[in-house]
Every structure is written in structure tokens, then in C-alpha cells.
């Protein structure tokens, strides 16, 4: 490994610890086969180093590490080990099949950990670091040493620990913010001072590993990079102990979007980010929140009318990266009560509807009325609104009443005709739909022969509406109609009127069965 002038390189190594630190998140454990599936995705994503597990902790981890070692030949495969001889020996054996193995040893260094966890003095910690890094280097050339709880460690002692680890053969020095305690200014200064002052620092890569307990993991990782770190330890979706780790998708896209500021790059194939995120969500059953940066469902969604109008003019007004660059198909214009007319018309055009000014105004009024009843308006809802608008060009349903009369049903319908006059008719039938269609035929004077009739749901969850679809014949010609409503019977009436109004318009234009009618 060439580590000369390593902390001046413009390349940031991405060390993904989803399969080790991430898996320690409650409820996120994976089987060896699941780990292998996830590791393949991380390999395809372009991750430099994959931390595959903690072999000394379980047989399952040892099996998973061995499986990954036999299959994955490009990335460096790392395993975690305590500063214990038995751990290091187990870890080295687990990595025997790996093409590019790394042994990652760690020891706590903060006064709190030294006193209450390790019960060791400064001198004992230094001796252990030297002994176990030397032992690890005897098995594998690529050794990473982590000073656990580095950001709460006295800086003079942290410098001494770092010097000893480098002298013993460590090739990467990781300074973790184990409990998410530090701030960007503090961690930037810590890295900058240590890299400038520790003997041998120019021979190794300095790494940052930040937790998110105060929501600063990504910001602290960027600050560490500014201080000279050239490896970032992170996880997909930010999963990990407690509040999680720095999210790979956040740190990667921050460096890419702000490339002119940082002048640094990664090897991450960013269009694979979303699919990798979604794979992890399926494997561990832990969905990300909708407003999660980069991979959340709302990351590229816009509902505000002002924002939507800006996006329609130029997407850069409200997006700093392209959704396609991280694996989303496109931005989403979420239509809801905050949406403006421009966004509604744009979506209707995308669905194939070209509206005149008066039509657009009417549909937008109907859209706003629908938004008072449901939170999100889908494409199916818009198509239903267009259908309703078409119906309103002829006969309009004013009211209807369906009742049982013995074994038969009775329907009373009241319509507004094209001139605005009210027309009321009743009819009986073998069921509510049969009676309804009979009353509509009497009211409009249009006779339709029913061939097929179907109903199904459109929309999402509690906002779903019923859609009625029917196929009918008139003078031997087949027609299809649809209607939607919260009420299935009303949807059926609208579907029938859809056909009837179309026939009436054809008559007005002198068109019959698709041909121009002869004029006497």
C-alpha cells in the first residue's frame, strides 16, 4: 500500500461499516447470507473499504466474513478486533480468503473509559497499543488503529497513542467521535494539530468516525476532512449504535455537490445510492424517515406552490443536486393543498391533457376542493377530475336516491341538463345499479346496452376513491365510460353519464358511430 503524503491526497476513502457498526443498531442484525447480499451492493456502489464484522463476537460473523472474503476481490475487507491476542488471531483467520484484508484494532483512550471501562493507566494503554498493533501487523500489512472515544481524550495523550500506533505499524489512524460529543470546530482543530505534530503522521491515513447523538455526524465528518482526514467511516442510511453514524449518502453527496469548495473526490457510484439504501431497508426492516436527506421519500418532493412554480421554471431554484445523480428517477411534484395551478396544469399535460383556459380554471377549482378532503392528489385522482369535468359538459348528476322495493331496487335521479334545467326520473331494476341505469336512460333519453361493469379502488389508503368502468353498446357500437367517487353507486352514475354525454356531443356535431352523419 502506498501511503506517501497520504493526508494531502484529493481522494477520500469511504470506509463503510454498515455490516459491523450499523448492524449493532437494535433490530438491524443480519444473517451471513444477508450480509453477503449487502456487501455485493456496497462493492457495486464503489465503497473502498467494507468493514465486514467482528469475528471474535460470534460464529455467524466469522462465517459472514469468510463468505465475503471468498467472493469480493476489489474492495478492502476489514474486521474489528479488540486489543486482545485471541481476538486478533481469530480475526486474522477469518480474513485468510480475502484478497485485500485489513485488521482494525481498537482501544479506549479517554479518561472516563480508562477509569471505568478498562481500569488501566495511561502507561498500560500505551503498552497495549504497541503490543497489539505489532501483533496484528505480524499477520496482515494493512492495520487500522482506532482510539475509542478520541474526542473526549486529552489531546497530549491522544498524540502519544497515535505516535505509538504508527511506530508499531498502523497504516490508518482512526479518531472516533464515539458518542457524538464533539463539534465541527473542535474536531477540525484536533485533526489539524495531530497531523501537524505527531511523528510519522505523513506515512498514514487519518480517519474519522462520527456518531450522530447530537445530529452532527455529517458536519463533524466534513470538518475532520477539512482538518486533514482522508478516510470517512460511515453507514448506509446512517444506521448504527444509538442515534446512528455519519450517513454514507450524506457525506458523499456533500463532497460531490460542494466539489468546488472541497476539491476532493470519492469513488462512490452515486446513481446506485438509492437502490443500495432501499436494499438495506428491506434486509433489516428499518425504513428511513421521509425527510431523510438524499434517500428519503421527500428528498426531491415539492408541494408548495411557490416552490413548484420555481421548479417548473428551473429545477436549480429549489434543488442542489439532480435526483438522477443518486438513483431517483426524477423530482416529484406532490400535488396537495399547497400546490398552485402551474403544477397542476403541468402534471395534466404530462398525462396527456391539453386544457383551454376555462377548462383549466374549472379543473383547478375541483382540485382545490378535493384537497380539502384528502392530503395527496394522485395521477388517478387527476384523471378522475378530468373525467368529472367532461361529464359536466352535458348532463350533470345533482342527486340520487336508491332504495329497496321488495326483491327489487328503486332509483330516483335528478340531473341538470346542458341548459341548466332540472330533470328527475325514477326506475326499478334487479339491483341498485340496474335501477340507476334505467333512471338515467329515462332522464337523458339515451338507451345503452350494458356489456360489462367493474369497480375498483384508485388513490392511496383512506384517500382512495372508487372507480366504476363500464362497456356499453349503442346502435351496435361499443363505448366505454369511467367515473370516480367516494361512493361506488355515484361513480357508476358518472360512468354512465360519461358515455351518454359523449353520444350527445357526437349528435350535436353530426357524428354517428365515428362517421359524419348525412344531413337531410
Swiss-Prot record:
<dbReference type="GO" id="GO:0009098">
    <property type="term" value="P:L-leucine biosynthetic process"/>
</dbReference>
<dbReference type="GO" id="GO:0005829">
    <property type="term" value="C:cytosol"/>
</dbReference>
<keyword id="KW-0028">Amino-acid biosynthesis</keyword>
<dbReference type="GO" id="GO:0003852">
    <property type="term" value="F:2-isopropylmalate synthase activity"/>
</dbReference>
<keyword id="KW-0808">Transferase</keyword>
<dbReference type="Pfam" id="PF22617">
    <property type="entry name" value="HCS_D2"/>
</dbReference>
<dbReference type="InterPro" id="IPR054691">
    <property type="entry name" value="LeuA/HCS_post-cat"/>
</dbReference>
<comment type="subunit">
    <text>Homodimer.</text>
</comment>
<keyword id="KW-0432">Leucine biosynthesis</keyword>
<dbReference type="InterPro" id="IPR000891">
    <property type="entry name" value="PYR_CT"/>
</dbReference>
<dbReference type="Pfam" id="PF08502">
    <property type="entry name" value="LeuA_dimer"/>
</dbReference>
<dbReference type="GO" id="GO:0030145">
    <property type="term" value="F:manganese ion binding"/>
</dbReference>
<feature type="domain" description="Pyruvate carboxyltransferase">
    <location>
        <begin position="12"/>
        <end position="274"/>
    </location>
</feature>
<dbReference type="InterPro" id="IPR050073">
    <property type="entry name" value="2-IPM_HCS-like"/>
</dbReference>
<comment type="pathway">
    <text>Amino-acid biosynthesis; L-leucine biosynthesis; L-leucine from 3-methyl-2-oxobutanoate: step 1/4.</text>
</comment>
<dbReference type="InterPro" id="IPR013709">
    <property type="entry name" value="2-isopropylmalate_synth_dimer"/>
</dbReference>
<dbReference type="Pfam" id="PF00682">
    <property type="entry name" value="HMGL-like"/>
</dbReference>
<feature type="binding site">
    <location>
        <position position="209"/>
    </location>
    <ligand>
        <name>Mn(2+)</name>
    </ligand>
</feature>
<feature type="binding site">
    <location>
        <position position="211"/>
    </location>
    <ligand>
        <name>Mn(2+)</name>
    </ligand>
</feature>
<dbReference type="InterPro" id="IPR036230">
    <property type="entry name" value="LeuA_allosteric_dom_sf"/>
</dbReference>
<dbReference type="InterPro" id="IPR005671">
    <property type="entry name" value="LeuA_bact_synth"/>
</dbReference>
<keyword id="KW-0100">Branched-chain amino acid biosynthesis</keyword>
<keyword id="KW-0464">Manganese</keyword>
<dbReference type="GO" id="GO:0003985">
    <property type="term" value="F:acetyl-CoA C-acetyltransferase activity"/>
</dbReference>
<feature type="binding site">
    <location>
        <position position="21"/>
    </location>
    <ligand>
        <name>Mn(2+)</name>
    </ligand>
</feature>
<comment type="function">
    <text>Catalyzes the condensation of the acetyl group of acetyl-CoA with 3-methyl-2-oxobutanoate (2-ketoisovalerate) to form 3-carboxy-3-hydroxy-4-methylpentanoate (2-isopropylmalate).</text>
</comment>
<keyword id="KW-0963">Cytoplasm</keyword>
<comment type="similarity">
    <text>Belongs to the alpha-IPM synthase/homocitrate synthase family. LeuA type 1 subfamily.</text>
</comment>
<feature type="region of interest" description="Regulatory domain">
    <location>
        <begin position="396"/>
        <end position="520"/>
    </location>
</feature>
<dbReference type="InterPro" id="IPR013785">
    <property type="entry name" value="Aldolase_TIM"/>
</dbReference>
<keyword id="KW-0479">Metal-binding</keyword>
<dbReference type="InterPro" id="IPR002034">
    <property type="entry name" value="AIPM/Hcit_synth_CS"/>
</dbReference>
<protein>
    <recommendedName>
        <fullName>2-isopropylmalate synthase</fullName>
        <ecNumber>2.3.3.13</ecNumber>
    </recommendedName>
</protein>
<feature type="binding site">
    <location>
        <position position="245"/>
    </location>
    <ligand>
        <name>Mn(2+)</name>
    </ligand>
</feature>
Amino acid at each position: 500500500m502506498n501511503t506517501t503524503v497520504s493526508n494531502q491526497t484529493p481522494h477520500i476513502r469511504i470506509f463503510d461499516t454498515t455490516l459491523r457498526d450499523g448492524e449493532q443498531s437494535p433490530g438491524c442484525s443480519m444473517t451471513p447470507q444477508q450480509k453477503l447480499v449487502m456487501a455485493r451492493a456496497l462493492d457495486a456502489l464503489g465503497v473502498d473499504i467494507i468493514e465486514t464484522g467482528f469475528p471474535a463476537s460470534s460464529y455467524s460473523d466469522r462465517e459472514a466474513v469468510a463468505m465475503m472474503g471468498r467472493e469480493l476481490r476489489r474492495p478492502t475487507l476489514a474486521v474489528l478486533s479488540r486489543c486482545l491476542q485471541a481476538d486478533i488471531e481469530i480475526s486474522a483467520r477469518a480474513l485468510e480468503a480475502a484478497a485485500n484484508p485489513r485488521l482494525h484494532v481498537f482501544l479506549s483512550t479517554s479518561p472516563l473509559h480508562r477509569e471505568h471501562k478498562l481500569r488501566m493507566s495511561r502507561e498500560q494503554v500505551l503498552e497495549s497499543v504497541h503490543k497489539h498493533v505489532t501483533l496484528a501487523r505480524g499477520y496482515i500489512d494493512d492495520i487500522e488503529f482506532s482510539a475509542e472515544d478520541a474526542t473526549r481524550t486529552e489531546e497530549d495523550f491522544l498524540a502519544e497513542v497515535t505516535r505509538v500506533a504508527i511506530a508499531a505499524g498502523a497504516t490508518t489512524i482512526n479518531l472516533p467521535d464515539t458518542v457524538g460529543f464533539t463539534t465541527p470546530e473542535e474536531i477540525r482543530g484536533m485533526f489539524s494539530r495531530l497531523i501537524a505534530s505527531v511523528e510519522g503522521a505523513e506515512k498514514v491515513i487519518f480517519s474519522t468516525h462520527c456518531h450522530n447523538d447530537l445530529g452532527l455526524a455529517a458536519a463533524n465528518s466534513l470538518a475532520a476532512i477539512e482538518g486533514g482526514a482522508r478516510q470517512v467511516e460511515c453507514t448506509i442510511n446512517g444506521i448504527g449504535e444509538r442515534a446512528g453514524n455519519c450517513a454514507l449518502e450524506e457525506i458523499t453527496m456533500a463532497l460531490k455537490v460542494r466539489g468546488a469548495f472541497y476539491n476532493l473526490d470519492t469513488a462512490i457510484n452515486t446513481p446506485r445510492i438509492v437502490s443500495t439504501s432501499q436494499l438495506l431497508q428491506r434486509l433489516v426492516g428499518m425504513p428511513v424517515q421521509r425527510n431523510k436527506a438524499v434517500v428519503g421519500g421527500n428528498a426531491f418532493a415539492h408541494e408548495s406552490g411557490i416552490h413548484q412554480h420555481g421548479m417548473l421554471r428551473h429545477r436549480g431554484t429549489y434543488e442542489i443536486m439532480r435526483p438522477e445523480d443518486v438513483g431517483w428517477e426524477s423530482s416529484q411534484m406532490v400535488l396537495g393543498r399547497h400546490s398552485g395551478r402551474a403544477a397542476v396544469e403541468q402534471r395534466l399535460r404530462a398525462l396527456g391533457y391539453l386544457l383551454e383556459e376555462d377548462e383549466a380554471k374549472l379543473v383547478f377549482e375541483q382540485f382545490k376542493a378535493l384537497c380539502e378532503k384528502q392530503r395527496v392528489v394522485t395521477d388517478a385522482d387527476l384523471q378522475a377530475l378530468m373525467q368529472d369535468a367532461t361529464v359536466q359538459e352535458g348532463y350533470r348528476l345533482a342527486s340520487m336516491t336508491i332504495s329497496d322495493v321488495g326483491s327489487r331496487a328503486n332509483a330516483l335521479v335528478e340531473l341538470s341538463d346542458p341548459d341548466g334545467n332540472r330533470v328527475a326520473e325514477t326506475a326499478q331494476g334487479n339491483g341498485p345499479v340496474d335501477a340507476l341505469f334505467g333512471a338515467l336512460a329515462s332522464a337523458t333519453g339515451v338507451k345503452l346496452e350494458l356489456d360489462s361493469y367493474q369497480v375498483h379502488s384508485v388513490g392511496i389508503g383512506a384517500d382512495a376513491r372508487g372507480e366504476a368502468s363500464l362497456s356499453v353498446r349503442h346502435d351496435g357500437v361499443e363505448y366505454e365510460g369511467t367515473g370516480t367517487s367516494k361512493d361506488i353507486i355515484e361513480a357508476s352514475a358518472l360512468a354512465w353519464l360519461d358515455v351518454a354525454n359523449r353520444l350527445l356531443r357526437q349528435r350535436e356535431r353530426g357524428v354517428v358511430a365515428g362517421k359524419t352523419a348525412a344531413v337531410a
